[in-house]
Amino acid sequence: MDKIVEINQVTKIYGKSNEKQTQALNGISFSVEKGEFIGIMGASGSGKSTLLNILSTLDKPTSGTIQINQEDVTKLKGNQLADFRAKEIGFIFQDFNLLENLTAQENIAVPLSLQGVKPKIIKQKVHQIAERLSITHILDSYPAKISGGQKQRVAAARALVTQPTILLGDEPTGALDSKSAKDLLDTMEELNTKDHVSILLVTHDAFSASYCQRILFIKDGVIHQEVKRNGQSREAFYREILTILGNLEQ
């Protein structure tokens, strides 16, 4: 399989050399294969949020390299980096990050508009992804008029409309009720298995993580443990994840 993301010996140190320093990441290496659904877990302060920020190119490592689609993103700067991020990386955040003065349809279209795509093509692409996520009936609605679960589906559509190399989820179910969370996770799993969308999910929630094929557990800035689902039922994988999380906290 093709490696679409390669992280090699990434470290991140906060603070100047003459001040008190904090090492958030300490030599992390792993890769993501095309079509993989991978989870990142760890307690608060473990380094998982720092890793996500570096993966999403919103922060730079102190040392090490990150390759996405065979491009070393640590060498990109300014507009070049912004263009790469817009085309190659999709984001789903916990708090949706929708623009309240735009309809669902307009929110989904934003990344394509920024890339200068023609309006006719934008409309086609927006309707295609909206159909895929079962939200065509709310395309003319504003965020204030739709539910949390629907908002997150709009956010997912916006993230996927550019057909990015990888979809990054930062606690995407965190603001949802249990039914909406399950619906979103079922959709993400379907996008992964049927459309081969590559997904990296950062979460503290064992139920969300049980949808992944492989999970990296981060502790003290290093990969403490890795576990694969290997054909287990989701219930069995969920129990295994809970056990590992319990051991991590000891």
Feature locations, PLM:
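Short coil-to-helix segment of the ABC ATPase nucleotide-binding domain corresponding to the Q-loop/switch region
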Residues: L102-V110
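Conserved ABC transporter NBD signature motif
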Residues: G64-D72
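Hydrophobic anchor residue at the start of the ABC signature
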Residues: A156
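Catalytic Walker B motif of ABC-type/P-loop ATPase nucleotide-binding domains
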Residues: L167-D170
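A short, proline-enriched helix->beta-strand linker immediately N-terminal to the Walker B motif
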Residues: V161-T165
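Helix-to-loop junction immediately C-terminal to a conserved catalytic motif
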Residues: S56
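Conserved ABC ATPase signature
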Residues: Y142-I146, Q150
